[in-house]
Amino acid sequence: MELEELGIREECGVFGCIASGDWPTQLDVPHVITLGLVGLQHRGQESAGIVTSDGSAVPKFRVHKGMGLVNHVFTEDNLKKLYDSNLGIGHTRYATTGKCELENCQPFVVETLHGKIAVAHNGELVNAARLRKKLLRQGIGLSTSSDSEMITQLLAYTPPQEKDDAPDWVARIKNLMKEAPAAYSLVIMHRDFIYAVRDPYGNRPLCIGRLMPVSDVNDKEKKSSETEGWVVSSESCSFLSIGARYCHEVKPGEIVEISRHGIRTLDIIPRSNGDPVAFCIFEYVYFARPDSMFEDQMVYTVRYRCGQQLAIEAPVEADLVSTVPESATPAALGYATKCGLPYVEVLCKNRYVGRTFIQPNMRLRQLGVAKKFGVLSDNFKGKRIVLIDDSIVRGNTISPIIKLLKESGAKEVHIRVASPPIKYPCFMGINIPTKEELIANKPEFDCLAEYLGANSVVYLSVEGLVSSVQQEIKFKKQKVKKHDIAIQENGNGLEYFEKTGHCTACLTGQYPVELEW
């Protein structure tokens, strides 16, 4: 909740779809992409865009982009502009670089020596300033302030060894990876192909799904030989709604070609100096939808384990466990189960307060959280509450909630946070406030419970988060046993994590790549 309210926002969502078999297809590609983007709406609410193609030798790209939520941008009339297509890619955006305006909406389309390409990007380039200067020195004009346009221009650059009649897209993508080590997941459309690309550090997620016949979608045991198409997405959460079955993640550094005939890996680019993988650990904590799959495990399950670990690290005498709706609910359930306390709802959220809410006047601003939450006071009068939240960023939203609960009859309110304190900005695709704005870096942090008005405040440790994320991951290459990554009394859980690969830069200040800022 704190993340959403106070500035830590999801990055972007990318999606692609290609029909299999004979073309023109009967598959409604624009609607599949739209539903896929609706499933990724939590990753970006500022703008949305779709580019489709018929996949012919001289393909016609159809483009529609707009500001706002997916369902507002893609009305039935707007979707008609994208018909007669066999493949396409889409994007939902939240600005991490570049202003929030239509010119920065993705996907970007650019003409190359071998025809048009369309590119959708999730992430943020760690060396964007240097790359911008390099492109401008080469005489390549940039029309937006988005680093995603720079990626598109780098892909349009013709490698010296490429022949005029034989485009080498693998070489172009490898050149991009050489110029920009992180952080990005990309979907690239050219003629009758879609390329799915993940940076060598695997910082941002990307996965592939198979569109099934409707009769086979819900039968997981049935191994159908029929395939209606392929999809690629930042998360797997929308696959069920479009009739797709999760296949696998795109590996760090992998270049995957998706065509009407199937999928194949073209290359896997290694990390320099044997660096570890650096998948963003906050995808598990907050950004991803709980029904998404990362590293062969469901996000919901990881959050539940975080709650259990938090109960081990920070037990407290109380009568019930609850949560600030609603991303912290799995952690709250895990905490309640581990410490044997009932899980009880104490707040209900007004789901329609958000970006479409009428701008409040002074009186409504003074009411603060009262317009966002209702209080279920009959559930907690005279009782001690353990309130679980996913994070506390600045602290000026959780404090009014604590006050509201106490004024409504709570005897005590103990705050337990299912992630460690955020101390550092992210420069790899997440919009985090400046270091000075973060509550963990302020003098008030030393007496946080008093500052917030709570009876106690405890965060999950970094080691506890890492253990919760990694305890079920199957490290096939390393042949790791579970007990090797458990938290030990000497604190070597974090030491082992550094060998296995999750980015905790916002928690520890240890960035996986050198930053050029």
UniProtKB/Swiss-Prot annotation:
EC category name: transferase
Binding site for Mg(2+): S327, D389, D390
Cofactor: Mg(2+); [4Fe-4S] cluster
PTM sites of type N-acetylmethionine: M1
EC number: 2.4.2.14
Catalysed reactions, semicolon-separated: 5-phospho-beta-D-ribosylamine + L-glutamate + diphosphate = 5-phospho-alpha-D-ribose 1-diphosphate + L-glutamine + H2O
Protein known as: Amidophosphoribosyltransferase
GO BP annotations listed: 'de novo' AMP biosynthetic process; 'de novo' IMP biosynthetic process; 'de novo' XMP biosynthetic process; GMP biosynthetic process; purine nucleobase biosynthetic process
Domain Glutamine amidotransferase type-2: 12-261
GO MF terms held by the record: 4 iron, 4 sulfur cluster binding; amidophosphoribosyltransferase activity; metal ion binding
Subunit structure: Homotetramer.
Propeptide stretches in the record: 1-11
Enzyme active site: C12 (nucleophile)
Co-factor binding comment: Binds 1 Mg(2+) ion per subunit. Binds 1 [4Fe-4S] cluster per subunit.
Organism: Mus musculus
SUPFAM superfamilies the record matches: N-terminal nucleophile aminohydrolases (Ntn hydrolases) (SSF56235), PRTase-like (SSF53271)
